[in-house]
Regions:
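Alpha-helical elements of the RecA-like P-loop NTPase motor core of helicases
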Residues: 16, 20, 46, 70, ...
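A short beta-strand-loop structural module common to alpha/beta enzyme folds
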Residues: 31-41
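Structural micro-motif
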Residues: 51-61
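Non-catalytic, surface beta->alpha helical segment in thiol-disulfide oxidoreductase systems
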Residues: 61-88
Length: 88
């Protein structure tokens, strides 16, 4: 199954906006995807380091084999996310 991993940190307004936009976009498209949320500190949290997270929010989509197929850094509109997610 495809996976969407969302990386954020505490007190991040852009992260809150992107999380909401992802939620709205996923509700608008028909895609079977596992969603994981990761909260931490850039450069200190192991999962952030292991996945080369340099900025938040960062959203990574992996295919059925666990290979990264999409990386979004920053905040994107619901419309853009619908377009991207509908092509998965």
């Amino acid at each position: 199954m495809k996976s969407l991993i969302f990386y954020s940190k505490a007190n991040c307004p852009a992260c809150a906006i992107m999380a909401s936009n992802i939620d709205h976009a996923l509700n608008a498209v028909n895609v079977d995807i596992n969603i994981r949320l990761r909260h931490g500190v850039i450069g200190k949290t192991k999962t952030f380091i292991d996945n080369n997270i340099k900025q938040v929010p960062t959203t990574i989509v992996k295919d059925d084999d666990g290979k990264e197929v999409l990386r979004l850094v920053g905040t994107y509109t619901v419309e853009y996310l619908i377009g991207v997610l509908s092509r998965l």
